[in-house]
């Protein structure tokens, strides 16, 4: 069989396993899902599974990586659109990312519940490093464009990109902390109280982002109130 066909067959089979795993994360939860569940669904042997993934954590990493692939394909073209000014690129990027996550809220929440467990700390760090590598070039180009247009002001576009992406990650961590704390009963807050905490977090991180990029106050919107409520309700 030609090498191209072998590679296509391998990719197709691997994606089939990921499709089943994603479904099981929805229906059973990652912690309850076993490799045997996947074998039973696909009618394959354990050896066949390990041909594609060497462990359950490797499967989780692949699920997140595929989600990152989807995000990259959807959002990088926005950052690279030559017809848009820099600030509009940033605002559209944030708005589209927020809407995209909201459309698959249940899956995001299922991943969130396992993503912040201690045993996945290394995987989390690794995936963020990969995301930084993927997004950074386009993000830096937008910052450089904004500096040329006079809407952004920084002498360090590369470093500003890294700091900006860490701020975005930090905001996501804050949301995760609030959501998971509420689910676990560790934080007894009303929906309105959670909304207000998230609202303040968005305002604070947005302010920090504008300062890092040298943007005027109120020129960047990371997340609106309606989108925040999606994660409170």
Give residue spans per PLM region.
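Helix-turn-helix
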Residues: 16, 24-58, 62-66
